[in-house]
Regions:
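Acidic, glycine-enriched active-site microenvironments
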Residues: 1-208
């Protein structure tokens, strides 16, 4: 018997885990509360967070040529996607063309009735400057990081294996897709993308 798995089998396992990551995590990693806290502690240490990140949210905007702008907020609670904590925040149309101002509007509105330990912005480090324009009660009690494809957006860099990056004000950290904590943060980002794209398609259908 060959102990080495062939490439096709490895791909099937990877696909299964990608499609069933929540169940896999729940039934294996999270059987012991210490494992949950261990993952959260890794994130706190990795990004020098002031908060222990029990609740993490990620935001993505959707619009149709700057019409019907809205931000979608995906959420993880104890590392599991928490749909009851998802939010859909409509933005005044006059702000739709300005991602920065509409993000500011969204965050202020979100934190009026919600909390989060860590906010993930799907943008470059530049967007982290939003914290300078937010009320102190939000900034003092919340951590912010961003995820950015950077040069990985182009086909040439995808071929070369260029990765995505996490950004803080002090750090630029390549995403390691072999680390569970990194993979889960990317999953949360992708979930925000999914919500925004679903809304965008629905809006176009309504226009037609």
């Amino acid at each position: 018997m060959n102990d080495n798995l062939d490439q096709q089998t490895l791909e099937q396992i990877k696909k299964f885990l990608d499609n069933n990551i929540d169940n896999f995590i729940t039934t294996t990693v999270f059987q012991d509360e210490r494992n949950i806290n261990g993952l959260l502690a890794k994130i706190q240490q990795k990004f020098d967070l002031k908060n222990f990140p029990y609740k993490i949210i990620c935001l993505d905007i959707s619009h149709n040529s700057w019409k019907n702008p809205a931000w979608w907020v995906s959420a993880m609670l104890w590392w599991i996607l928490s749909k009851k904590n998802y939010r859909h925040i409509k933005v005044p149309e006059e702000l739709g063309w300005n991602d920065y101002e509409s993000l500011k509007y969204c965050l202020i509105k979100y934190f009026k009735n919600n909390t989060a330990d860590l906010v993930i912005l799907d943008w470059w480090k530049w967007q982290l400057n939003i914290v300078n324009d937010l009320p102190n009660e939000i900034v003092l009690n919340t951590d912010f990081i961003s995820i950015w494809k950077w040069k990985a957006r182009s086909r040439k860099w995808k071929i070369s294996g260029q990765t995505e990056y996490f950004f803080t004000f002090e750090k630029q950290i390549p995403v390691d897709y072999n680390l569970l904590e990194d993979k889960l943060l990317i999953k949360l980002r992708d979930e925000a993308h999914r919500l925004a794209n679903k809304y965008r398609i629905k809006s176009w259908q309504n226009i037609k």
